[in-house]
Structure formats: structure tokens, C-alpha cells
């Protein structure tokens, strides 16, 4: 669709890249933005009074406003970070003080470990209960499961907006509305790392308390991410990472912290990453989420139908065949062939896919699976890529089939 915009393919023109859920490739505009900082700015934030440093700080302020507008937030609700994992861990540390042994933390069974382990460890540390919402066979959370699992002592609910295994999208506004009807006081945290690469986010409509996502899933660079937090939380919560740039007074008996976001951004940020994140957001806006969604659904439907038509009952699509509820990700199992063998042999043919548990062991173990093979699509993919994948998979099946 837009392969010419990605310099990666200048170096690897024959490669079929079907692993965008691990990290998306970077368009030239994003690469140029990072190089621009490194070559033309290369100064720190809020440290220097000379013009170049002030220009850098002003540009980061512009990108913070751009990021806020992108998800319908306020600039002071946007905290830059090294990625989704880092900020979810930081958030768990921040919320630790408010948690007691009488409380419960609830997560879904399809969470990435980044939105599972921090809450599991926090519950263990505070001797709180740790509960898991079990999803249906189609990857959603039922009202009955919410009612059975959420109780008055539920303090935190953590959910992924889009599973990195099944590709199934949650109806986030409806899900959060249902959670709030049962436990209106609970803090709701959403991992949107996969979702934001495929569909627009409106944090006001979602009504989550915190939302985290990474730049590198969004055609941006690695090492940069965002934590959105409602302003009424951020203005009262205490930081748990300390250093330069986040205090008004460090000398008194009690430290006086700056307002958000400064109080949560101690030390030097990944400034080149922030420049590039701004370019990635502009890139997505230039394409448009509607076009992106149509592209995603066309490819995943085509891939799913070709797998079933070609291999029949040997292939099981994880999360079902309702392509309208999933976006950008299609995982499957193949009877008699291990996903690692499939991925390794595909790799030797220049086709890049992911195999394993995808940092989502609870989901795999809960479904009796040791691994799955995952295809994940980007703007640079086409039906021709899927045809090449199917042809290669036919050859792998023939290679590994028992000989009579």
C-alpha cells in the first residue's frame, strides 16, 4: 500500500515483513525527524537558556500538544516515557501507596506480560488479591464474567484494548462503562500498545483513568512511549522515579514537586524519540485511521480465508473467524507442525512472522497451547505478501509431512 515510504525495503526489497505487532517499520519522515534532532538540535530540555535549547523545549511542547490532541487529552495529561512496559511498571509503583491487603487487582487472561506482571507483583507485595477475567472463545469479556469477578474491594482493573495474540479488539467504552457500573471507584488502566496502531483512541469517550502506548508500534522509534493519566489523578499522585527537572524545592523536609507532566519525567528524556513520535503521529494522520482499518481488515480476512481454503482443518485461527472484531493480527495453529518450525523455515524463505507465546503465557496456557504462529500486518503489506506466505507454507507442509 505504501511500501515506497519505508527505506527498509530499499535494503531488503524481497523481504516479506509480517511482524508489525512486534515492531512496525519506520517511514522516512520518522527517520528524518530523529536525525533532525540529532544533527540540528541535540540540546536538552528545560536546561539551557540559549536559543537552541529553548527551541528544542518549544518543539517538544508542540509534540506534547499534538500527542494530546491525537487521543483527545490535555497536554498536561501526557507523560513521555521509554515505552508501555516502563510506564505500566511506574504506574504500579505510584499506585502502591493507595493499595491495601483488603483490595483486589483484576486483569484479563489475554494481557501482555507488561500489563500482567506489574499488577501480579504489586498484589503479591501488598498481600492483595489478584484475579483474572476469563475471556470467551471469541476473545471478549462477557457481562457475566465481569459480575462474577469484580467485587466491592476491586481497586485496580487492567485491560488490553487489543490482544497481541488474537487481534481481537475490545469495545473499550462499553467495557469500561460496565466495569464502572459494578465498581465505580476502581482505577482502570488500559494497555493500548497494539490498538493505537490500528484504530483511533478518544480517552474522553473511553473514560479510562490511565492509557499507555508505545511509539514503535505506531511506525515510530523504539524507546519512546506515552502514559495518559486523568489530570485529577496526576495532580495528586506522587512520583516514584526521582531526579532532575521534576522539583520546585528539594531542600526542605518535604520535597515540593512540579505539576504534571514534569513531576513524572525525571531526568533526560528520549528527545530524539519524541521528535520522531511527533512525525509518526503526523504520518498516521496523513493516512487516516479509516483507510488504515480498511487495509487491516482486507489483509487479515484474505489471509484467514487463504489459510482455511488451502489447509482446511489442519489450521485453526485463534480468536475465531469474525474479522470485523479484529485488527492487524492473525494467529493460528497448524496440526502436526510446531509454530517455531513454521517461523524458522519461513524466515529462511525471507518471510518474517512471530512464533511463540508472544509475551502472553496466561492466554496460551489457559487455552492449552504451547505456542501460536502470528501474522501481523502494516501499511507496507499487500495481498501479494500473503500469497508468498501461503506458497511458502505449502512447501513447509510438504517438507515436514511424513513420507510414505
Where are these regions (language model features)?
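Pyridoxal 5′-phosphate
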Residues: 1-404
Amino acid at each position: 500500500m505504501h511500501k515506497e515510504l519505508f527505506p527498509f525495503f530499499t535494503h531488503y526489497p524481497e523481504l516479506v515483513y509480517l511482524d508489525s505487532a512486534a515492531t512496525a517499520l519506520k517511514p522516512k519522515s520518522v527517520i528524518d525527524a530523529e536525525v533532525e534532532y540529532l544533527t540540528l538540535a541535540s540540546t536538552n530540555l528545560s536546561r539551557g537558556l540559549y536559543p537552541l535549547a529553548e527551541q528544542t523545549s518549544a518543539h517538544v511542547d508542540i509534540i506534547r500538544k499534538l500527542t494530546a490532541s491525537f487521543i483527545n487529552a490535555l497536554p498536561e495529561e501526557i507523560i513521555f516515557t521509554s515505552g508501555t512496559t516502563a510506564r505500566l511498571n511506574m504506574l504500579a509503583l505510584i499506585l502502591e501507596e493507595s493499595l491495601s491487603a483488603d483490595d483486589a487487582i483484576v486483569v484479563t487472561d489475554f494481557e501482555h506480560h507488561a500489563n500482567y506482571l506489574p499488577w501480579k507483583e504489586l498484589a503479591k507485595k501488598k498481600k492483595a488479591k489478584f484475579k483474572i477475567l476469563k475471556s470467551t472463545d471469541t476473545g471478549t469479556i462477557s457481562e457475566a464474567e465481569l459480575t462474577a469477578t469484580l467485587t466491592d474491594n476491586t481497586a485496580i482493573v487492567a485491560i488490553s484494548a487489543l490482544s497481541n495474540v488474537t487481534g481481537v479488539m475490545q469495545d473499550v467504552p462499553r467495557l469500561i462503562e460496565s466495569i464502572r457500573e459494578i465498581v465505580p471507584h476502581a482505577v482502570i488502566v488500559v494497555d493500548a500498545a497494539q490498538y493505537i496502531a490500528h484504530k483511533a483512541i478518544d480517552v474522553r469517550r473511553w473514560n479510562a483513568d490511565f492509557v499507555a502506548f508505545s511509539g514503535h508500534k505506531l511506525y515510530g522509534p523504539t524507546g519512546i512511549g506515552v502514559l495518559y493519566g486523568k489530570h485529577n489523578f496526576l495532580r495528586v499522585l506522587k512520583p516514584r522515579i526521582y531526579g532532575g527537572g521534576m522539583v520546585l524545592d528539594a531542600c526542605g523536609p518535604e520535597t515540593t514537586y512540579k505539576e504534571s507532566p514534569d513531576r513524572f519525567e525525571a531526568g533526560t528524556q528520549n528527545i530524539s524519540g519524541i521528535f520522531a513520535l511527533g512525525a509518526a503521529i503526523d504520518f498516521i494522520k496523513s493516512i487516516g485511521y479509516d483507510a488504515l482499518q480498511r487495509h487491516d481488515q482486507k489483509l487479515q480476512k484474505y489471509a484467514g480465508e487463504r489459510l482455511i481454503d488451502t489447509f482446511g482443518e489442519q489450521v485453526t485461527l485463534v480468536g475465531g473467524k469474525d474479522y470485523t472484531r479484529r485488527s492487524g493480527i492473525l494467529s493460528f495453529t497448524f496440526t502436526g507442525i510446531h509454530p517455531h518450525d513454521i517461523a524458522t523455515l519461513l524466515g529462511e524463505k525471507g518471510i518474517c512472522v512471530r512464533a511463540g507465546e508472544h509475551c502472553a503465557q496466561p492466554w496460551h496456557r489457559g487455552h492449552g497451547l504451547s505456542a501460536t504462529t502470528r501474522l501481523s500486518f502494516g501499511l507496507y503489506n499487500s495481498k501479494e505478501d500473503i500469497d508468498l506466505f501461503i506458497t511458502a507454507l505449502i512447501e513447509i507442509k510438504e517438507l515436514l509431512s511424513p513420507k510414505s
